[in-house]
Each structure stands twice: as structure tokens, then as C-alpha cells.
């Protein structure tokens, strides 16, 4: 069995390739060619933290695996990662353990790739300004993926802890050579954006102003009914609301559950799963005036396909630590 660390994965990753594999996984899922149950969500430590159990089988892609991650928001106060985890791949023919991959980096990359796929199909082609609300680890992968599919010229950042936004601004400028500006008001931050990303642990909406025509939103932070990043009017006012899995999104996120409970939005108003847009079954963006929202909660089959991609690259490159059970 091969053990692949975060650093080893980092050296193997090509974001354009990861985006392509994420799209393939989404397409297989929406065509009902995978077994991807609703993930198990286990609260612990007086419900402050969450463990997520995510298995998947993709028959056509010969992939079988399991991801287990923990989300501990308070870890950031002690300088530790808020997401820790592991992904196990099994041999599709024999069922033997094939690989163990560090899970927090993989999660960051696949979260980014999902937003990359959504941005490719739903953002305006001439989108130039990206606004990111929440500048934690997940924002790194999303920024890289959005840059891969759109020619972004300006980045606007907002974070509750301003110092972290400034640190992220420096990261963007040094790694990607793009100007990045910190705003102290979230409503001001979104006002000039073509693409908005929300990646926070918020339980109440992170902005209140109405969305401008033509904007695209990737909302990736809320993965529990008690979490809500988007104001209800952002969902209700969107021309197209898109998800990875209708079942998972309706089961897991306050971003959809709250407006539904308020009687403002109906489950059947979800435009499509992203895989249906990739396959051409449903339309993506159709004009420059549309407001589009991609509400992401994560999907195990994407993790497993990205893990398989990383495993194959590791074998090809002679990377990783081989161990005997």
C-alpha cells in the first residue's frame, strides 16, 4: 500500500487536470453510474466539531474508496488545521488496500476543482474580478481553480479576521502575480465582483446586499443545516441554482434549507446538478445578465476520483511511501 503525504500530492497536482477529473466524476454521478450515499455526519465534542464519512464506488471509472475527515473550527485559534482527514483507495479488482492519502490537502484541491468546473460553465466568459469571502485553507484551491478557467485581473478579499485577509492577499500576489485588495465590509467587497466565492464556517449570512446582474457565486462553506453563508434572497433571486447532488444539498445545507423553510424557495426550483450541465443535458449560463449560484457541499465520488488521479501520478513518478500491512 502506498502512503501519499500532503507535500507529495502538492508536487503532483496540475489544477487543470484535477478540474477535468472532477468534471468526469460529476458527470458519472449525475448519470447515476456511481454509488455515492449521503455522507455520514457525526457531531462530537458537544457538537462543536464534525466527523464526515464519505464512501463511493464509480464502476465505469474503476474507482473504490472512502474519505474520513474531521472539521474542528476552533483549531485555527491554536494554529492547527480545521480540516484533517484521510482517503483510502482500494484495488477495484481485488479489494486490497491500494493507497492512503492525506485528506486535508486533497479536500482543498477537490473543493477548488469543483468551483473551477462550476465557474467554467456558469460564470461570464469575460469575468475579470474575483471576490473571496473567507480566506482559510480552502480559499487557496478555489482561487487557483478559478484562475485556471477565467482570466482574472483583480482579487477582492474579505475575512472577519483582517490580518488573515492581508496574509492571503500577499499569498495571491506572490504565487499568482495578481493584485489582491482587502475590504473591511463584505457588502462593499461583493459590489464590484464578477465571481463571488464564500468559504466560511458562518451560521448566518456573510453579506446582505442583493446580487448584481451577471454575477456568479460559488458557495462552498455551509455543509450542515445549521450553517448558512448566503442570504435567502441570493438563492431566491438567482436565475440558476446548481448543486453537485440535489439529494445531498437539500439534506445538508442551511443555504437551501433556510429559504425552503421560509417558504421562499422550493426544492424543484434547483436548476440542475453540475454533472447534468457538463453532459449537456441542462444548460449552463445562457446570457450575461443571469445570476448563477453553485451551492457545493462536497461529493465523495469526486474525492475518490481525484485520489485515484493522484495515486496514478505518484506511481508514475515513484513518489510515496510503500508499506506492508
UniProtKB/Swiss-Prot annotation:
A Pfam family recorded for this sequence: OCD_Mu_crystall
GO molecular function: oxidoreductase activity
Entries under SUPFAM superfamilies matching the protein: NAD(P)-binding Rossmann-fold domains (SSF51735)
Reaction(s) catalysed by this chain's protein: L-proline + NAD(+) = 1-pyrroline-2-carboxylate + NADH + H(+); L-proline + NADP(+) = 1-pyrroline-2-carboxylate + NADPH + H(+)
Disulphide bonds in the chain: none
GO cellular component, one term: cytoplasm
Key words, A-Z: NAD, NADP, Oxidoreductase
Family matches, as InterPro entries: NAD(P)-bd_dom_sf, ODC_Mu_crystall, ODC_N
Keyword tRNA-binding: no
Catalytic activity, EC: 1.5.1.49
Family according to the record: Belongs to the ornithine cyclodeaminase/mu-crystallin family.
Function in brief: Catalyzes the reduction of Delta(1)-pyrroline-2-carboxylate (Pyr2C) to L-proline, using preferentially NADPH over NADH as the electron donor. Is likely involved in a degradation pathway that converts trans-3-hydroxy-L-proline (t3LHyp) to L-proline.
Database matches in NCBIfam families: PRK08618.1
Protein name stated in the entry: Delta(1)-pyrroline-2-carboxylate reductase
Amino acid at each position: 500500500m502506498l502512503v501519499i503525504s500532503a507535500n507529495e500530492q502538492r508536487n503532483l497536482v496540475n489544477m487543470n487536470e484535477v478540474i477535468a477529473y472532477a468534471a468526469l466524476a460529476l458527470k458519472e454521478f449525475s448519470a447515476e453510474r456511481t454509488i455515492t450515499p449521503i455522507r455520514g455526519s457525526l457531531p462530537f465534542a458537544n457538537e462543536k466539531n464534525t466527523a464526515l464519512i464519505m464512501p463511493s464506488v464509480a464502476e465505469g471509472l474503476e474507482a473504490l474508496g472512502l474519505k474520513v475527515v474531521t472539521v474542528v473550527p476552533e483549531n485555527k485559534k491554536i494554529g492547527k488545521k480545521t480540516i484533517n482527514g484521510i482517503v483510502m483507495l482500494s484495488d477495484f479488482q481485488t479489494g486490497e488496500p491500494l493507497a492512503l492519502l492525506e485528506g486535508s490537502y486533497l479536500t482543498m484541491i477537490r473543493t477548488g476543482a469543483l468551483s473551477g468546473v462550476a465557474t467554467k460553465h456558469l460564470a461570464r466568459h469575460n469575468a475579470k474580478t474575483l471576490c473571496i469571502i473567507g480566506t482559510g485553507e480552502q480559499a487557496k484551491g478555489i482561487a487557483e481553480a478559478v484562475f485556471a478557467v477565467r482570466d482574472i485581473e483583480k482579487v477582492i478579499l474579505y475575512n472577519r479576521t483582517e490580518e488573515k485577509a492581508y496574509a492571503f492577499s500577499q499569498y495571491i500576489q506572490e504565487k499568482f502575480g495578481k493584485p489582491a485588495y482587502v475590504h473591511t465590509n463584505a457588502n462593499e467587497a461583493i459590489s464590484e465582483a464578477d465571481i463571488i466565492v464564500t468559504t466560511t464556517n458562518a451560521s448566518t449570512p456573510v453579506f446582505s446586499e442583493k446580487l448584481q446582474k451577471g454575477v456568479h457565486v460559488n458557495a462552498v462553506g455551509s455543509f450542515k443545516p445549521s450553517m448558512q453563508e448566503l442570504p435567502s434572497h441570493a438563492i431566491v433571486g438567482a436565475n440558476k441554482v446548481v448543486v453537485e447532488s440535489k439529494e445531498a444539498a437539500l439534506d445538508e445545507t442551511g443555504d437551501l434549507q433556510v429559504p425552503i423553510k421560509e417558504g421562499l424557495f422550493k426544492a424543484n426550483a434547483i436548476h440542475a446538478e453540475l454533472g447534468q450541465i457538463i453532459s449537456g443535458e441542462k444548460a449552463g449560463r445562457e446570457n450575461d445578465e443571469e445570476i448563477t449560484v453553485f451551492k457545493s457541499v462536497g461529493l465523495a465520488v469526486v474525492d475518490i476520483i481525484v485520489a485515484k488521479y493522484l495515486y496514478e501520478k505518484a506511481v508514475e513518478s515513484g513518489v510515496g511511501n510503500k508499506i506492508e500491512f
